[in-house]
From Swiss-Prot:
This is Heme oxygenase 2. Residues 1-28 are annotated as: Disordered. Keywords: Acetylation, Endoplasmic reticulum, Heme, Iron, Membrane, Metal-binding, Microsome, Oxidoreductase, Phosphoprotein, Repeat, S-nitrosylation, Transmembrane, Transmembrane helix. CDD domains: HemeO. The lineage of its organism: Eukaryota, Metazoa, Chordata, Craniata, Vertebrata. Residues 2-294 are cytoplasmic. Residues 1-12 have a biased composition (Acidic residues). The modification N-acetylserine is found at S2. It comes from Mus musculus. The modification S-nitrosocysteine is found at C264, C281. GO terms for molecular function: heme oxygenase (decyclizing) activity; metal ion binding. The chain crosses the membrane at residues 295-315. A soluble form arises by proteolytic removal of the membrane anchor.
């Protein structure tokens, strides 16, 4: 008689015990939250390493560029929340519908008013990259609403994860009010604990009645969402290269080529600040050079070329 005790199905106890962890791991990997986490890791890493995101996290952001990014977010969330409202009763999405806790459009409108004024809608338009993202969201909401999960997951979970960090970076780099004007997007007033809410949201995702094929399609759609975001970042990088860095209001005074040279930031950085005689202010040199008519003509031609390229890019 065998020393191993067999079960009624003919599987001995040792084999049954060895299969238990495998079954548990398979169940875990079948969870939509785990599939999304693993299936979008590469795209997530690439998005985090785009130049725009790296510059933002370093506080190297111009206000005009931040305004363009806020505009892109406004159009993106307007589309996403319109489609979420449309599908709030759809069984594949209804358990993830939390307008009070998550919706960002109202907060973004406040930010747009702060940056552009009351007539902000007359001043902004959806960029080419953002429009592609918006079009995709509308298509999904109207034709494949089960895939809305991918876009909600990509946007809201990311906002809850890094929102407070980005808010502080923006406030510090752009000298925005600590009272929240201009950064309402990052404030989730009705979420007391972001980590707990994310866990709750993931549990709701995992409870959705979806087959494995649909889950795989959601992962694929989430990767598309990351790609659309990266296209917007790339567009912002291009726009940023055309914008002059905004001078902070409390920065060092700029020497105008006249008067006390010690007001020049270049001079202030020199180790031998006690002697004026040997100092050469680059601002003075630049002003003198640009006063030459021939170089003024070259500069004007260069500006015209850049303007022409910009016009072509935005056509």
């Amino acid at each position: 008689m065998s020393s191993e005790v067999e079960t009624s199905e003919g599987v001995d106890e040792s084999e049954k015990n060895s299969m238990a962890p495998e079954k548990e791991n398979h169940t875990k990997m079948a969870d939509l939250s785990e599939l999304l986490k693993e299936g979008t890791k590469e795209a997530h890493d690439r998005a985090e390493n785009t130049q725009f995101v790296k510059d933002f996290l370093k506080g190297n952001i111009k206000k005009e560029l931040f305004k363009l990014a806020t505009t892109a977010l406004y159009f993106t969330y307007s589309a996403l929340e319109e489609e979420m409202d449309r599908n709030k009763d759809h069984p594949a999405f209804a358990p993830l519908y939390f307008p009070t806790e998550l919706h960002r459009k109202a907060a973004l409108i406040k930010d747009m008013k702060y940056f552009f004024g009351e007539n902000w809608e007359e001043q902004v338009k959806c960029s080419e990259a953002a429009q592609k993202y918006v079009d995709r969201i509308h298509y999904v909401g109207q034709n494949e609403p089960e895939l809305l999960v991918a876009h909600a997951y990509t946007r809201y979970m990311g906002d809850l994860s890094g929102g407070q960090v980005l808010k502080k970076v923006a406030q510090r780099a752009l000298k925005l009010p600590s009272t929240g004007e201009g950064t309402q997007f990052y404030l989730f007033e009705h979420v007391d604990n972001a980590q707990q809410f994310k866990q709750f949201y993931r549990a709701r995702m995992n409870a959705l009645d979806l087959n494995l094929k649909t889950k795989e399609r959601i992962v694929e759609e989430a990767n598309k969402a990351f790609e659309y975001n990266m296209q917007i970042f790339s567009e912002l990088d291009q726009a940023g290269s055309m914008l002059a860095r905004e001078t902070l209001e409390d920065g060092l005074p700029v020497h105008d080529g006249k008067g006390d040279i010690r007001k020049c930031p270049f001079y202030a950085a020199q180790p031998d600040k006690g002697t004026l005689g040997g100092s050469n202010c680059p601002f003075q040199t630049t002003v003198a050079v640009l006063r030459k008519p021939s170089l003024q003509l070259i500069l004007a031609a260069s500006v015209a070329l850049v303007a022409g390229l910009l016009a072509w890019y935005y056509m």
